[in-house]
Amino acid sequence: MTPADLGDSPILLDTDVFSFVVWSRGPAAMYEPFVVNRLWVLSFATVAELRYGAIKAGWGPTRLRELDRRIRLCVVVPGTDAVATRWAELNAKFKDQVGMNDLWIAACALSQNPVLPVASHDHAFGMIAAEFNLPV
């Protein structure tokens, strides 16, 4: 997928891509063309992973507030019945191949109308894309 393929669509960021771009680390430059001037969407699972990582790393109040501020700039897809149904379908297919939170992230993207493209640094989303028509 190229940035032009996205048109003006919002994009769902997985945890790694959000972290790369927000904190300007790792391969952030690789993802910037896909995310600049676009509405960012996060899965509730991504929000949980981000907060867990910050707590585990011992972030202080200032960094935690900054993380919360960055998350509030995004639309967060909650864990709805539609998301749970998509997760069940994905888990039935990929249980031993894809991590649980990646399945939740994909389920959030697939449960939207239209389906949201996903920016991910994880090869697992390629497997999901091939089976479930998920743009990555």
Predicted regions and their residues:
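Short, polar loop motifs at secondary-structure junctions
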Residues: 24-26, 121-124
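Short loop/helix-cap segments at secondary-structure boundaries that form the rim of catalytic
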Residues: 31-33, 125-131
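Active-site neighborhoods of divalent-metal-dependent phosphate/nucleic-acid chemistry enzymes
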Residues: 2-6, 74-119, 127
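Histidine- and aromatic-rich ligand-binding microenvironments
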Residues: 13-14, 43, 98-99, 122
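Active-site-proximal, substrate-binding regions of enzyme catalytic domains
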Residues: 49, 58-75, 82-83
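Short, well-structured N-terminal submotif of metal-dependent ribonuclease cores
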Residues: 1-42, 53-68
